[in-house]
Amino acid sequence: MLYYLMLKRRKSAMQRYSDCPQILRDFLAYHESIKGQSPLTISEYHLDLRMFLRFMKLMRSDMPVNTPLEAIDIRDVDLNFIRGIETSDIFDFLSYLATDRVYEPSSPAPDHGISAKSRARKLSAIKSFYKYLTVRTKLLEENPVADLEYPKIRRSLP
């Protein structure tokens, strides 16, 4: 009975990520089961990496450039697609986050660009994903984010 409950819980947890490719679901399962990270951390990794892969797919396709990221299906992203991502592509994504990403879409006058702290968190998720693919699973030989620096975060006054 306990095994059944655990299997049911695992299945429902992975169904939450049914909008993602298998390789991303495997990464999230690794962080959940092996690394023991919190559900909130796993959820943030899911959102950050889903946005990253959607952006990459938009940049590499014939879709109109103004296609909303939320409308892009990434379930067909495979290892070859991920292998083709270069450091310059990641710079493009970080630039998009810094200048074009709407900070608060529901506000009457939305600001563009997210904070350095938010960009650093997204870069951390990408770095973790590529470390998993190169070091843990050895599915990739090269890590395009290995030497990327994090955005400078301003310290606030106390």
Predicted regions located by residue number:
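N-terminal core-binding DNA-recognition domain of tyrosine recombinases/integrases
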Residues: 7-11, 25-40, 50-157
